[in-house]
Swiss-Prot record:
Organism: Bradyrhizobium diazoefficiens (strain JCM 10833 / BCRC 13528 / IAM 13628 / NBRC 14792 / USDA 110)
Name of the protein in its database record: Flagellar motor switch protein FliG
Functional summary from the UniProt entry: FliG is one of three proteins (FliG, FliN, FliM) that forms the rotor-mounted switch complex (C ring), located at the base of the basal body. This complex interacts with the CheY and CheZ chemotaxis proteins, in addition to contacting components of the motor that determine the direction of flagellar rotation.
Predominant place of localization: membrane
Annotated Gene Ontology cellular component terms: bacterial-type flagellum basal body; plasma membrane
Alphabetized SUPFAM superfamilies for the sequence: FliG
Record flagged with keyword Iron-sulfur: no
PANTHER family xrefs: FLAGELLAR MOTOR SWITCH PROTEIN FLIG
Domain of life: Bacteria
Designated gene of the protein: fliG
NCBIfam families assigned: fliG (TIGR00207)
Family: Belongs to the FliG family.
Lineage of producing organism: Bacteria, Pseudomonadati, Pseudomonadota, Alphaproteobacteria, Hyphomicrobiales
InterPro entries the record matches: Flg_Motor_Flig, Flg_Motor_Flig_C, FliG_a-hlx, FliG_M, FliG_N
Length: 329
């Protein structure tokens, strides 16, 4: 078993009372590496722990096992580190894989990264791309509009050694403005939590609860509706994200999901397929005959949840149902 994983098990076994002084002596890179290991441990069987650290068996849970996950890691860090430092660490370990910011960016899907960078200054884009793996930088450049891509290329060609302070400033901005949103770690209020719950209701249950809530508390009902991400909101995906989503979903499920969809939603999905694939899907849908509303709701919920999972991994970008209010997962 590798050293970092052994250290993660040790820190979990030490717990809050005995691990505090050790945490305070670690630098940021060590804390990030150790936190990442802790957050991905899952269940550590008692035999493994006993073989490594017999003296810590008495401090383990009643089941004789340790459970390492994001929440347990965050709670432990909060005991010993300032909130801002904990938030930064958790943002990074919940985000794309990589030992540092630049490795993480190289693991973010190029369309997602390009959509973010194209709103930055060309000089900033040049600095960022100069730090990425060449093959990833090339794919990002290929997505930019031609005039922007050419501007960035010229700036990269003329770029001299970038001061450490500039790199650190860019890295800080990426961490706070991009990675923190990408990893979806910001604190959510009760309306956001409830919107997620409503997203998982079937259509009839959702309508019933929303209607009742509107009668009791219209303001809260409107806030929840504004925060919900629904099947119809998938039409706001960019073409690359839509195609990524469809590559990851069973075509039969997509056909069922589109059975009760409005014309705009259907045209959006058909428009992001080849003509042949769209015709085949339309034929399959026609051959299905009547489909239970419950099955349609389940298929649509599957697509929405899949989209959220892909967005959390940095493979696609989602937007909320209000056109002027973008949300990056």
């Amino acid at each position: 078993m590798a050293g970092p994983k052994r250290a993660a098990i040790l820190m979990l076994a030490l717990g809050e009372q005995y691990g505090g002084k050790i945490w305070s002596m670690l630098d940021d890179d060590e804390v990030r590496q150790l936190s990442l290991e802790m957050s991905t441990l899952g269940t550590v069987e008692v035999d493994t722990v006993e073989d490594m650290l017999l003296e810590f068996v008495s401090r383990m849970s009643a089941s004789g096992a340790l459970m390492g996950n994001f929440d347990a890691t965050e709670r432990l860090l909060q005991q010993y580190l300032p909130p801002e430092r904990v938030n930064g660490i958790m943002d990074e370990i919940r985000g794309p894989a990589g030992r540092n910011m630049w490795e993480k960016l190289s693991n973010v899907q190029e369309e997602v990264l390009a959509n973010y960078l194209k709103n930055e200054y060309p000089q900033t884009i040049a600095v960022v791309l100069s730090k990425l793996k060449p093959e990833h930088a090339a794919r990002v450049l290929g997505i930019f509009p031609e005039d922007l891509a050419l501007d960035v290329v010229n700036r990269m060609l003329k770029m001299e050694a970038v001061q450490k302070e500039v790199i650190e400033s860019v890295e800080k901005t990426l961490r706070t403005e991009f990675m923190s949103n990408l990893s979806q770690t910001r604190r959510r209020d009760a309306h956001e939590v409830m919107a997620e719950i409503f997203n998982n209701f079937d259509r009839q249950t959702e309508t019933r609860f929303i209607t009742s809530l509107e009668e009791d508390n219209r303001e809260s009902a409107e806030r929840i509706k504004a925060l919900m991400f629904t099947f119809d909101d998938l039409v706001k995906l960019d073409s690359g994200s839509a195609q990524t989503l469809m590559r990851n979903v069973d075509k039969d499920k997509l056909g069922v999901a589109l059975k009760s969809a409005n014309e705009d939603v259907r045209n959006f999905f058909f428009g992001n397929m080849s003509s042949r694939a769209a015709k085949m899907l339309q034929d399959d849908m026609a051959a299905m005959g009547p489909v239970r509303l419950r099955d349609v709701d389940e298929a649509q919920a599957l697509l929405v949840n899949l989209a959220k999972d892909l967005a959390a991994k940095g493979e696609i970008m989602l937007t909320k149902n209000r056109a002027d209010d973008e949300l990056v997962y």
